[in-house]
């Protein structure tokens, strides 16, 4: 999860987030090289007295500044399209969970179980225990098995919301009357925090998300107790 004064992204917990981190570094390096070239050209223009006032035609230069940006865009687009395809691909999920956004809490339903559903509210600051995080803890965590493909069905009962967990690389809009879906797979156990990422009213900041990723045996025990 994030920590104070953090400059980079959160540590990747899912394969998708790892790909997004690699793509971020790839794109950032391209931006750095372009910026360095532009600054170098500007410094030359400011420090040299050479001018080309008689230049009327420069087809070679025009060819370079047409082809080079096209190549750069291709180098950015290809890995981006690959990741977009991976994010939309859903192959035989092991578990399906439906989440509904409300003003201002989340409700969850495990559709593979007959009667496993609950609401998840933020714990008020005055009720927090030592070590718990302000504005991020909930009364009911979403317990999920790790190292398994899980499909999330996301919608809303009232206004626009957005279900987001940064360390898993997830952000999906919750739209009234529309059912969106996304997949997640956590590679290690732990607690993963997120929040509503669409301004949805006065208590928008009080809609945290907490995923508790556990081994399959623990999940089976928990689900049996909940049902």
Curated annotation (Swiss-Prot):
Residues 1-14, 88-227 are mitochondrial intermembrane. Residues 46-59 are mitochondrial matrix. It is a multi-pass membrane protein. CDD domains: CcO_II_C (cd13912). This is Cytochrome c oxidase subunit 2. The keyword Translocase applies. Its cofactor is Cu cation. GO terms for molecular function: copper ion binding; cytochrome-c oxidase activity. It comes from the Eukaryota. Cu cation A1 binds at residues 161, 196, 200, 207. Binds a dinuclear copper A center per subunit. Cu cation A2 binds at residues 196, 198, 200, 204. The chain crosses the membrane at residues 15-45, 60-87. Component of the cytochrome c oxidase, the last enzyme in the mitochondrial electron transport chain which drives oxidative phosphorylation. The respiratory chain contains 3 multisubunit complexes succinate dehydrogenase (complex II, CII), ubiquinol-cytochrome c oxidoreductase (cytochrome b-c1 complex, complex III, CIII) and cytochrome c oxidase (complex IV, CIV), that cooperate to transfer electrons derived from NADH and succinate to molecular oxygen, creating an electrochemical gradient over the inner membrane that drives transmembrane transport and the ATP synthase. The lineage of its organism: Eukaryota, Metazoa, Chordata, Craniata, Vertebrata. Component of the cytochrome c oxidase (complex IV, CIV), a multisubunit enzyme composed of 14 subunits. The complex is composed of a catalytic core of 3 subunits MT-CO1, MT-CO2 and MT-CO3, encoded in the mitochondrial DNA, and 11 supernumerary subunits COX4I, COX5A, COX5B, COX6A, COX6B, COX6C, COX7A, COX7B, COX7C, COX8 and NDUFA4, which are encoded in the nuclear genome. InterPro entries: CcO_II (IPR045187), CcO_II-like_C (IPR002429), CcO_II_C (IPR034210), Copper_CuA (IPR001505), Cupredoxin (IPR008972), Cyt_c_oxidase_su2 (IPR014222), Cyt_c_oxidase_su2_TM_dom (IPR011759), Cyt_c_oxidase_su2_TM_sf (IPR036257).
